[in-house]
Amino acid sequence: MAPGCCTTRPRPIALLAHIWRHCKPLCLLLVLLLLCETVQANPDAKRLYDDLLSNYNRLIRPVSNNTDTVLVKLGLRLSQLIDLNLKDQILTTNVWLEHEWQDHKFKWDPSEYGGVTELYVPSEHIWLPDIVLYNNADGEYVVTTMTKAILHYTGKVVWTPPAIFKSSCEIDVRYFPFDQQTCFMKFGSWTYDGDQIDLKHISQKNDKDNKVEIGIDLREYYPSVEWDILGVPAERHEKYYPCCAEPYPDIFFNITLRRKTLFYTVNLIIPCVGISYLSVLVFYLPADSGEKIALCISILLSQTMFFLLISEIIPSTSLALPLLGKYLLFTMLLVGLSVVITIIILNIHYRKPSTHKMRPWIRSFFIKRLPKLLLMRVPKDLLRDLAANKINYGLKFSKTKFGQALMDEMQMNSGGSSPDSLRRMQGRVGAGGCNGMHVTTATNRFSGLVGALGGGLSTLSGYNGLPSVLSGLDDSLSDVAARKKYPFELEKAIHNVMFIQHHMQRQDEFNAEDQDWGFVAMVMDRLFLWLFMIASLVGTFVILGEAPSLYDDTKAIDVQLSDVAKQIYNLTEKKN
């Protein structure tokens, strides 16, 4: 570019800033003119507003005659059910409170005011009925958001302010968490009696019928995730107070709610039922594991934790016990009983014959009869005949190496006895008797065996607290010695053989009875397993089945009457 021609083009932003600096007063003046033009665009409404409120006194009741009654129509539009606090017994709702009444000072001819039929005025500038929530639980009895009121040329005034009310609600916890609650909101005039202000529901058709079935408008209701609305009736009452002779009318808006139980079923019911059935498995756990009592105590502590959790949810009332609380008390009783029974079973399992002798009826009932009813297989060695076992024990002993050697020696010294006599002799040896044994002398081959057995008789006779087996044998041996002269070594050997036989017999009986006690404990475990399982099933269905809502098929009306709910469910169906 040639020298002297170095002009630059202004940037767009800089150009706008330059125009704004020089034209700012002009722009502000233009905006003011537009606003003035807008205000002057409806001079009829301004003139009407001045005419209606210039001489209006908002403190005076709007009647032409002092004896007249102002009829106030009251309605409630529910927007949201925010919360129902069971602990504090407070219902929190987001509502629109609809008011309608006639004010003769607000009548005009629309033709005189350019066809204006409605006028919106601040509610602070007109008379308002002092409608309050009687059962308020938060301190705010009246509407705090002062929205504009709508004036009709006929004199009708419509005022619909929004409000969040916290009303007291008496909670019935008998069937928690399958419960239904009925709450109400009582509205009435705080100052004026029934001769000055008469209340009527906005949907009430005649004066005789004071009850309206659909008393709350649910068209703008947003469905709750915890409660279903079953009914919203409204009813007009008149109450006489001690202070005044005139009646005070009020309107009750009732809300019947049914709890959606999915949350509590998943987080409370199923864990409680599962933990209660663990008490049945205590009796399936073997007694030798050493964990039966620990499992019982763990289950008891778990149920105590759930009981404390419920006490934090429900109100502190002594009028009724909640359904879930009944079930927890029932299961805690079962678990506590299982602890006691488990201790008894463990005591039976570890009993010893030296301290506890099993009675015949215990053996007959718990070993022979009850296992068949419980479909248990009884080991064959537990069904033995103890008397036959004692008789045959000598024959078993004679078949051992030592017993056979003793019998051979007796046969040699008896001069070749017959087989029948030998069998009789074996039986007598097994039974502990020595009478009638025709033994003449002992040989040198038996002397070593006798010497081996001759020493420890005195020490073994009192082993394990068993009675001496030698009592009664001295007389029989003396009789034998009187008839036949036996060597002293053979007599001593017979004494020791009899002791060993009786000691082994008592030891086997000791072990067998120890096994019997263990099997009795096992049978008791199986018996109480079935009893506790049946009790748990019956208790679960009986206690939890008391709730009437489980059999109530009433459909919720909030989904049917709410336009918002219909839109939500329609969108959900389209997405699916």
From Swiss-Prot:
GO MF entry, a single one: acetylcholine-gated monoatomic cation-selective channel activity
Signal peptide extent: 1-21
InterPro entries: Neur_chan_lig-bd, Neur_chan_lig-bd_sf, Neur_channel, Neuro-gated_channel_TM_sf, Neuro_actylchol_rec, Neurotrans-gated_channel_TM, Neurotransmitter_ion_chnl_CS, Nicotinic_acetylcholine_rcpt
Localization in the cell: Postsynaptic cell membrane; Cell membrane
Tissue-specific expression: CNS in embryos.
GO (cellular component) term, any one: neuron projection
GO aspect biological process, one term: monoatomic cation transmembrane transport
Ranges in the topological domain labelled Extracellular: 22-261
Transmembrane intervals: 262-285, 293-311, 327-346, 527-545
UniProt entry tagged with the keyword Transferase: no
Pfam (any one): Neur_chan_memb
Family matches, as SUPFAM superfamilies: Neurotransmitter-gated ion-channel transmembrane pore, Nicotinic receptor ligand binding domain-like
UniProt keywords, alphabetically: Cell membrane, Disulfide bond, Glycoprotein, Ion channel, Ion transport, Ligand-gated ion channel, Membrane, Postsynaptic cell membrane, Receptor, Signal, Synapse, Transmembrane, Transmembrane helix, Transport
Membrane topology, from the record: Multi-pass membrane protein
Cytoplasmic side: 347-526
Role this protein plays: After binding acetylcholine, the AChR responds by an extensive change in conformation that affects all subunits and leads to opening of an ion-conducting channel across the plasma membrane.
Protein name per the record: Acetylcholine receptor subunit alpha-like 2
Lineage, highest ranks first: Eukaryota, Metazoa, Ecdysozoa, Arthropoda, Hexapoda
